[in-house]
């Protein structure tokens, strides 16, 4: 399990680098009030975005390895580290001063995540999910994701639109991870031929691409304080739920649940606090007017 956590943390680091570069690229192309495939064409002409995609691909490879060695309910929450890592990487790349308030938020995320994972400590589970289990999973997850996208399209550019699109992307990310874990289980059990013949392999690639498109759109739709918490927290919670329900991973219960809730509350506070800091917005190369005005007083 320790190896899975390390690989997941490396995947989060690679994804954070990709996010920093994608965010910068997304703000250099024309914004739109609708979902347009031309956005991808514009981004493909942007070298910075292509470099970000390399980071995302490396992240996917590391994530697949992490899922092969560990449970979905452990691996997916580790991606919460992507947010503080974006602060560290973006600060180094763009020479942004990180305030004391931002480092406090990072500490809350790290401690909260450690407490959450230690308290849950899921055990057991299976390496892949039989086909019939995927029918309700895909219908429910896809239905909620579609509802979020439709809700976003009915709203103007701003907080609600960005949050809905980011939450939809997060659901897609968690579902991609669940499908990826099954594909890796098939690879380990039946070999390369079965891996490339399984529908899960192509499903996780397609849903992952859709999630990437939704995330790029969410980045244009509104401020970071709306999109980042929705993306980060929805991904983690959905990953745990899918791990327990379809992979039959068994978290600890009893008093451990109280500690897990406390840990999740602490990391949630850290995510929202960090998302409100101006230095994170600058690290992701945005222009956030909604950042906490008190931050400069505590820098």
Predicted regions and their residues:
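Polytopic alpha-helical membrane proteins, predominantly small-molecule transporters/carriers
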Residues: 1-299
